[in-house]
């Protein structure tokens, strides 16, 4: 078969996602190969992957790409040190023994069959993907349909050393976006960008968001969603099956619960336990002879935790606490939690001082002095009696007559 699904596993921590992806795809597609590129995994995990993947391709030490020398500042902005080795994803473009590959990240929930993407005609230097929720002019590299090419691979590799900060996020997504730009945004004066990106429906790679517009959009298109992508550091296998954290109003069943429901059905529940014991065997290296030895032991799996106990997930070398549920603050307005520093001037807290005298012009001073002297010289004037109050309101508006007609009677 010249078409295949492909993914990437760096370290043992994403093993649950790798097991989920292989078993879930096999439920709707038994014809195409399942390929996974691996690095820094234990021998036991390697043997387990061989049970479910058509090919397990080990990235040799001298071919691995480290992010740090290239895009450390950009990666630091994401605050995701766990993505330090994600640039190794570009090795998927070097699997030229396939005519067409569909890359899928391991942190996904598959709701519907999406093998129809293989019907798309794709050429070298073309890529089909879904817009990224963070900046839709870029695509999300969690799902990509493309034609493998040694030319594309070498071009991506060269850009890492030739163009400082070529990846806007320090990882594979920024680098691949630099080459495969949206056809509507392409400019003819940039020779560094050789590929073209064609946008797929958001239903093929839906990333969750707490944006107030997200829930109505998801509800309207729920039956069309093919794949849910759990972006961020917390993955579904790190949470309880009963964890609800997708939409605060409970309009949807938890996607995390759906992931666990599917996961528990694989291999008669063999992978159901929530906590996997640490696998501390030696890593697979280029000159390791242990990779050829027979390993009879399978990955040991502990009993599921009681959901009534305090929850803590441990796998590999990482430990995660269950995050607090997402609360709905959409009615609070923008920046309602902004802790803005309040500055208080010293004169605002002291007792108020005496008001300053109002400045008076020189002419006004002379006029006031003359009036005072005149009042001393004038005799006291007897004020007349005030007029009697009016009986009717209109009497106050009577005008003094200016003409008088004599009465000759």
UniProtKB/Swiss-Prot annotation:
Record note on what altering residue 212 to F does: Disrupts glycogen biosynthesis
Gene knockout outcome: Disrupts glycogen biosynthesis.
Glycosylation sites: 212
Keyword Amino-acid biosynthesis: no
Main location: cytoplasm
Region ranges (Disordered): 283-303
Key words, A-Z: Cytoplasm, Glycogen biosynthesis, Glycoprotein, Manganese, Metal-binding, Transferase, Vacuole
GO molecular function, one term: metal ion binding
List of residues binding UDP-alpha-D-glucose: 8, 14, 80, 89, 105, 107, 140-141, 169, 172-173, 232, 235
Family per similarity comment: Belongs to the glycosyltransferase 8 family. Glycogenin subfamily.
Role played: Glycogenin participates in the glycogen biosynthetic process along with glycogen synthase and glycogen branching enzyme. It catalyzes the formation of a short alpha (1,4)-glucosyl chain covalently attached via a glucose 1-O-tyrosyl linkage to internal tyrosine residues and these chains act as primers for the elongation reaction catalyzed by glycogen synthase.
Designated name of the protein: Glycogenin
